[in-house]
Amino acid sequence: MSTDKQAAVAVVTGASRGAGKGIALALGAAGATVYVTGRSQRDGDADLPGTIHATAREIDALGGRGIAVACDHRDDAQVAALFERVAQQSGRLDILVNNATFLHDDLIKPGPFWSKPLDLVNILDVGLRSAYVASWHAAPLMVRQRRGLIAFTSSFGASCYMHGPGYGAQKVGVDKFAKDMAVDLREHNVAAVSIWMGMLDTERTQRVMQQHPEQYAGFAAMAESPQFTGRLIDALYRDPRLMEKSGMVLVGAELAQQYGIRDIDGRQPPSHRAMLGGPVQAHPAKVE
C-alpha cells in the first residue's frame, strides 16, 4: 500500500460496523496497520452487531494489523489520546478516514424534520465537528512527514434531499472540509478528499431491508459493499498523482471506473449522478 517499503498506518473512525468497518478491512487487506475507533467494545453495546475488537481481529486475519481503540468522538480528550497513541506507537500516520457519524434510529423515518426527535441534529457533532477535530490532530503528523491522505466519507445527500436537513448539512460540511483543508495542506504534500458513497449493504440497511422487503426490492443489485470505498482509498493513497485530486469531492463509483476497481463480488457499482446530482467542486478564489 505505501509508496515506500513501510506499510501504511491508517486511522478509521467509526469502524465497529458499516462503512467504517469495511474501509478498515480493505486497508488491512492491503497490508496497512489500521487503528479502528468506536464505542462498541462488547457484543450488545449497540443495537447493531459489531465491535472494534472484532474488526481488528478480521484485519489481522486479512494480513494487516488491526488495533482497536475505544474512542467516543464526542470527547475531544479521547480523540487527542488516540492520535498521541498513534504517534508514540507507530511514529507516523499516512491515512485518516473520517467516517464516525451519529445516525439516529429515526433518521429514515418519513416526515418533516420538526416531526422527528431533536437529537437527530447530533450528526453535526459526531459526523461534522468530530471530523474537524480528528483532522486537526492528524494534520501535524502528516505535515511532518510530507505525505498523507485525509478522506471523508460522504454521499449524494450533499446534493439532493436525503434523510432530512441534518443529514444533508453534515455531508455538505465534510465536503467543504475536504476542499478547504486541501488548500492549507497542499504546500505540505498532504491531500484531502471527500468520497460520495452509493447505497451501502451494511448491517443497518440489511435490517431495514428485512423490515421493508418490497420497498427495497432490487437494492442488492445496486448496493456497494462497505469494503468498496476502502479499496478506493487504498488506490488514492498509492496514486503518484494523488495531489491532483486533493480538494475534490469524488463520486466513489466513478473513481472506481478510473482506477479499474471492482467491488468484492466483481461488480462495477453504478454512479447515481444522473438520478441524485453531482458534487460541486471548489472555486479557485482564496480569501484569507
List the model feature ranges, each with a label.
Residues S2-R39:
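Canonical Rossmann dinucleotide-binding motif of NAD(H)/NADP(H)-dependent dehydrogenases/reductases
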Residues A7-A8, G64-R65, R92-L93, P110, ...:
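Active-site loop of short-chain dehydrogenase/reductase
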Residues A30-A54:
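Conserved glycine-rich Rossmann-like NAD(P)H-binding loop of the short-chain dehydrogenase/reductase
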Residues G50, A70-L82:
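The beta1-alpha1 cofactor-binding region of Rossmann-like NAD(H)/NADP(H)-dependent oxidoreductases
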Residues F102-D106, W114-D119, I123, L149-E187, ...:
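Catalytic loop of short-chain dehydrogenase/reductase
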Residues S135-W136, K179:
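A short, exposed helix-loop element centered on a Lys and neighboring polar residues
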